[in-house]
Amino acid sequence: LVTRVFPDGIDKLPKYSTPGDPRLMEYYEMALAAHVAPAPKFATEYRSLVGGIAWVGPSERPDALHANGSCARAYTFSTVELYGCAVRILLYLADTCELGITFSAYAPNADVLDAASDSDWHVTRSTSGGGLRLAGGTAHAVSRKQDSGSGSSAGAEIIAASGLCDDIAHARGCLEYMNLPQSAPTVIDVDNKAVYDVSRNYSATKNLRHLDRRAFRIREYTFTNVVAARLVRTTENWADMFTKVLDRGPFLKFRRLVLNPIDSVVARVSAVIGGIWAPT
């Protein structure tokens, strides 16, 4: 894909430390408002580029999942600005092609599944983001547009968390089939207190009565000991990577948590050999 898009190579092109352009969502909102169908040739080039990048997103490079997903929403009303955002994603992936998800038995609690959920609220349809980690690496990641709009950030966060709980329930079933049962509820990190409170309380409030009953599945999964919500700061919620365009600092911090790069694994193995640290 890089050779086809850049036949002269990428050595003289800009280097990017993050895949998402700072104005990505602004460009998307402008394109959505205009909603002008592109020329057929440009539309084909755009879909080819964004569709090609999408192949590596969920399974190999979830760090680019949100940026690519945002570009993919504009298939029918793509613009030159969004094409430039897609080119940036491709350049970022090409410059960091040595990165990937690393699973290691030396990761802390390697046999325990953990998760994180987040949402980016919009007036129209918000973005649900989250992931499941096992053995240090992200085994499953999502960044998807919600089925319907939500009138509040709390509602969008609840919908996102409940959707990820379905994925957690499926993953726990697969792990049990693979002889790796989860003896305790899977911890899911959330950074919204409304989600945390809803998961622990069956009562409803007037501000949340507009949500469908299915949006409260996190509460049902909590009371059946499938998940356990944990309230964390936004700066500690690695699912933020799947819902927002982050600056370099927080992006690199969350990328290490999501990908578990090989240098982290080597450091742990060296510590084990030296008797400094032992896996749990």
Regions from the language model: what does each represent?
Residues 1-280:
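Long, low-complexity, charge-biased intrinsically disordered regions
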